[in-house]
Amino acid sequence: VSYISSLTLKVADLERFITGWNDSGKEASLRVANDVWASQAIMAGERAGEISVIYHWDSIDAAMDGVVALRNDPGILKTLSDSGSETVRRVLVRVDAERGGRNGKYVTLLTSISDPIAPEAQTAAVDRVWEVVSRHGGNGQMWGQILAGGPMTGTYILATTADSLDTLLEGTAEIMASTEQQQYFADHNATLTGRTMSRRLE
């Protein structure tokens, strides 16, 4: 088990944010977090345009201490100020499973609610879904649950990275049409609550 914290921002000057991120923000983040990457929501309803910065941690304590350290980093503070960035939310996610890598031009995020899922049932679902996704251009997937996130607490998430969303969504359609997936939803009283499509910021 590992954890991620997701910082969501509204950014007035995206070019300045990206410049600051590349000049110092990413490097400063990697001094305290295991991994970090940023994305911009493109197809996301009322969230369109928001920036998300994803930090990977070994523990909740590391996430708590790391966030405090990053909020006091002079370079990061300057980037946030210069780009007119405003914090929208920060959530903590328990990562239950990962497949593949984290690289890709795009990121999709599916959210759902359901009854509690036994580890063995989740592992079987992860492997079944990844087998299809990996054949349709998926570079990697991360499954988890929001542990602290206001009204989103308890929500399950599935993040997928890919270089083509057209190809990826063909795989998603195959999964959703399968009897196995429909049975999984029925067994766990699961309901999809949202999907966002984002581009990675480099």
Question: Positions of the model-derived regions?
Answer:
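Short S/T/G/P-rich N-terminal loop/turn motif that feeds into the first structured element of a domain
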Residues: 1-202
